[in-house]
């Protein structure tokens, strides 16, 4: 009997990236409720869960025996900045739109990198450089630890196609260092603080504002509200 791990049982929320949708049995509503019920235990990381880091590219990683640390360019803030530049006709170099957030997962077990085949089977591989954060699942929570599965994208050289990998870890503590506010100030100064605070207010709620279209709508909404208030 094979003792291979399978994505369908390890992290079914991530399975659609690897297997046919018809094979997946997962109650998303129940999972969302699970996240809400464990909000205090998840701490600051909780507000970013369920796809809010999707497409955030990896700035840096650090792995040792008791830590997995990754710094991302927060895609949601990046997209909102892009929307502000478009709406307000600003001349800002796109390469400057870097909004770092550092995720430190303290752990006392091995962090594993895994390939996933067409049947969902996981095969552990050597750690590799990650390029883009795609998704995550909180697999289990108790008083001592939180078990996670993450999907990342890796781009290869020499015309080799990119590939998705699954990273598994068990965290005893999570430390989040948000540096987006400082980056925003360096790029925009204080001219668009009201827009930025409005964006963060809705980002911190259950409202989805993590794509370009939604961010453009949010800016229009703020302008309309401001006009009504000043009338």
State where each predicted segment sits:
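Surface-exposed, interaction-prone regions used to assemble/regulate multi-protein complexes
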Residues: 2-231
